């Protein structure tokens, strides 16, 4: 069983940074910064950023799509808290998260997507104290679809004969363990993420990429836990997980189960 994680520095695609200044928005009193991932239409980009700033986040890294709109320069001037990362080449989910973690400055990084909304307009200082106290590699949120129904986002390992299976269920109890962060969403300990080697950029399928990270965290004695107070709502349907046993599954299997 291969438990040696890749380092985040093993692959560094080129990119341009617009706005902000590395570490300029972080201060000791607010331990969480934001990593905003983007997909699909960008109709409400400005509103999303404004909402995050209004909640109180002082440092936001936005991972942009290739060939993104010219409005970025205007947004960068309006929101000095935001640094826009413009990749020069296509990159899978893990690569984008790895870059965002390197570019973030806080000890904890809240990863979410542009098609999600915070279900609360404020996050209390008590909640951030809990983030520190739980000492988890990642705290995953309650996820609801556009109708308000809970997404089965908590993953549990199961065994069927000699086969390894993952069973997704809706969250039940605060602090409940999950095998991996659904849709890569959650509040990550930046230090633990770095020590674990981040996401394996050689695994292109996001499902096996996230599962590989979760298995590695477990093998290294770290935990991924559900935080009931953290809630996100999807604007539309949540993304479907592609669990096809493809070549990426083969790499995951050899690294974690062989």
Tell what function each PLM region has:
Residues 157-179:
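Short, flexible, basic/aromatic active-site loop/helix in glycosyltransferases
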Residues 219-258:
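Active-site-adjacent helix/loop segment of glycosyltransferases
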Residues 87-104:
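Glycine-rich, basic loop-to-helix element that forms the pyrophosphate-binding segment
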Residues 107-117:
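Short beta-strand-to-loop acidic/aromatic patch adjacent to the donor-nucleotide binding site
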Residues 180-188, 192-197, 203-230:
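A short, conserved alpha-helix in the catalytic core of glycosyltransferases
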């Amino acid at each position: 069983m291969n438990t040696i994680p890749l380092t985040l520095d093993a692959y560094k695609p080129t990119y341009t940074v617009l706005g902000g200044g590395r570490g300029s928005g972080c201060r000791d009193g607010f331990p969480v910064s934001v990593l905003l991932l983007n997909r699909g239409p960008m109709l409400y980009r400005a509103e999303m950023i404004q909402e995050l700033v209004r909640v109180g986040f002082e440092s936001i890294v936005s991972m942009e799509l290739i060939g993104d709109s010219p409005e970025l320069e205007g947004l960068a001037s309006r929101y000095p808290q935001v640094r826009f990362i413009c990749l020069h080449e296509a990159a899978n989910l893990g690569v984008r998260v790895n870059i965002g973690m390197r570019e973030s400055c806080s000890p904890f990084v809240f990863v979410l997507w542009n098609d999600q909304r915070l279900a609360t307009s404020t996050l209390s200082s008590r909640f951030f104290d809990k983030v520190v106290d739980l000492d988890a590699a990642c705290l995953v949120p309650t996820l609801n679809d556009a109708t308000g129904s809970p997404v089965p986002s908590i993953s549990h390992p199961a065994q069927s004969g000699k086969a390894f299976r993952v069973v997704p269920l809706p969250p039940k109890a605060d602090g409940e363990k999950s095998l991996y962060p659904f849709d890569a969403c959650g509040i990550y300990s930046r230090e633990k993420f770095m020590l674990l080697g981040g996401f394996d950029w050689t695994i292109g399928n996001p499902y096996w990429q996230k599962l590989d990270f979760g298995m590695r965290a477990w093998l290294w004695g770290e935990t991924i836990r559900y935080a009931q107070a953290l809630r996100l709502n999807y604007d539309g349907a949540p993304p479907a997980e592609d669990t096809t046993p493809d070549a990426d599954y083969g790499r995951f299997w050899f690294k974690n189960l062989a």
